[in-house]
Regions:
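A short acidic/small-residue loop/turn micro-motif
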Residues: 146-150
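N-terminal single-pass transmembrane signal-anchor helix
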Residues: 1-22
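Conserved alpha-helical elements of the SDR catalytic core
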Residues: 18, 25, 45
Length: 164
């Protein structure tokens, strides 16, 4: 009986040490996936601006997923085509950024000369600690509080923290 108590105590100690490390590793993986998602959005916006709406950017993820006439492939994968998209513990959004009306795209959708994309943890402190955002300048910014940096913070001289 005593041996069983010792074994249970040892297992409990191992779990007490390993579970927090596992949670930190999972949050780090979620944050890396969120960064990857925002980079994907930035790349899709660059392709969209060059091919579908010269100088204009989509303001909805669904617009990026819509192929131009004569093509069967959109600019972003279907798993990121829902506004907002939920991936790996983060909510990915695309919204109008600072800019003015751009040209209509190949499908007749309105565009802007700027966009604002964000990745915010579903549950700050559980699914991720940091939030991320990007604009048409394609620089990712980070906020350690779990709230995405604002458009104003990401403007030149706005005081935002670029992701290193």
């Amino acid at each position: 009986m005593f041996e069983l108590l010792v074994v249970v105590g040892i297992i409990s100690a191992i779990l007490a040490i390993s579970v927090p490390m596992l949670m930190r590793a999972r949050m780090a993986a979620n944050e890396a996936a969120a960064i990857g998602s925002l980079r994907t959005v930035s790349s899709a916006e660059a392709g969209y601006s060059g091919a579908a709406a010269p100088g204009g950017y989509a303001i909805l993820l669904a617009t990026l997923a819509t192929p131009c006439p004569g093509s069967s492939v959109g600019f972003i994968s279907p798993d990121l085509s829902i506004d907002p998209s939920t991936r790996n513990g983060y909510i990915i959004t695309l919204a109008p950024g600072s800019g003015v009306a751009g040209p209509d795209d190949c499908n007749g959708s309105a565009t802007l000369t700027g966009y604002y994309s964000t990745a915010e943890p579903i549950s700050a402190g559980r699914t991720g600690h940091r939030a991320f955002a990007s604009t048409h300048r394609a620089v990712l910014f980070v906020d350690p509080t779990g709230v995405p940096p604002t458009n104003a913070q990401m403007a030149p001289g706005g005081g935002g923290t670029p992701l290193q």
